[in-house]
A protein has these predicted regions:
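Bacterial Sec-dependent N-terminal signal peptides
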Residues: 2-30
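A cross-kingdom feature marking solvent-exposed beta-strand/loop segments within repeated
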Residues: 32-33, 76-96, 113-115, 158, ...
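Short, structured motif recognition centered on aromatic/hydrophobic residues
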Residues: 39-40, 45-48, 106-107, 165, ...
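A low-complexity, Ser/Thr/Gly/Pro-enriched, surface-exposed linker/loop concept
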Residues: 57-88, 125-131, 181-216, 256-268
Length: 270
């Protein structure tokens, strides 16, 4: 009788173990996928960035949320290697809380059914897996110049979203129309004008899958490194005040002199 009871208890315990999924001990972790290391929730489901959120607020509303549900864990428990200072929470226009990473709101993709799925990558050219080591990201937004006017991608006045390169924190990068291939024609030797158009440099690590790493190079500018894209030296615009999504530089001193950069940018001239 004792033996039968022991066997019964053992079987019961085994059944519970088989049917009860493990409880995640963290809310966010880094997981290896076919796209490299990406941010996931505690069960391994991939998290995503939306390029239209470049200003730090969510542009995904209505039916978009059915396809891209928000990741709403506030003060998430983090796996080793993640920095709590990189995470925050925003309150969406619909009142819902949404977690952010380095200012980018985080989402799931409805068609990702298994841990490590990355089916949402490059959907419509505006959704990308969330990574900790992006050197650059892409933003989609209305270009608004320092003159307060709205511009299209050809720098004529008008309303239309344009896609452009930003740093990992969503800050816009620019080219200078007078520069040559991998030659900075703007910055003075004493860097006295660097505050207005600061040169940009960062080690190239991860990039969105639509951006070709081979199109970047590093040049020397009076002893400082500067990153180039398609031969164009890259700059910030000082009056953007290091603010996400600002594009004030596109109208200075007139539209087209300091353009944003993207895949459609021509190669810099020799």
């Amino acid at each position: 009788m004792g033996l039968l009871l022991a066997v019964s208890i053992s079987c019961s315990d085994d059944d519970n173990d088989d049917n009860t999924p493990p409880v995640p001990t963290v809310d966010v972790m880094i997981k290896e996928t076919t796209l490299g290391k990406v941010l996931t929730d505690g069960s391994g489901k991939t998290l995503y960035f939306f390029t239209k959120d470049v200003a730090g607020t969510s542009a995904c509303t209505g039916g978009c949320l059915t396809v891209w549900p928000v990741f709403s864990v506030a003060s998430p428990r983090l796996n080793a290697g993640l920095n709590a200072a990189d995470f925050s929470t925003i309150t969406r226009a619909d009142g819902q809380k949404q977690a952010t990473y380095k200012g980018w709101p985080l989402y799931y993709y409805k068609d990702d059914t298994a841990a490590g799925d990355v089916k949402g990558e490059n959907v419509n050219g505006v959704w990308f897996v969330a990574k900790t080591d992006y050197t650059m990201m892409l933003g989609n937004a209305q270009l608004v110049g320092n003159d307060g006017k709205s511009y299209k991608s050809d720098y004529t006045e008008g309303t239309a979203d344009t896609q452009f390169l930003v740093d990992s924190l969503g800050r816009t990068l620019y080219a200078f129309i007078n520069d040559k291939k991998n030659v900075n024609k703007y910055t003075k030797a004493d860097f006295s004008n660097d505050d207005f158009w600061p040169i940009y440099y960062a080690d190239i690590k991860s990039l969105p899958s639509t951006i070709d790493k081979s199109l970047f190079a590093v040049i020397d500018v009076f002893g400082k490194k500067q990153l180039t894209y398609k031969g164009w030296p890259l700059y910030y615009f000082g009056p953007d005040s290091k603010t996400r999504g600002m594009t004030k530089g596109v109208s200075v001193p007139r539209p087209g002199v300091w353009p944003i950069v993207n895949k459609e940018s021509p190669n810099a001239p020799d």
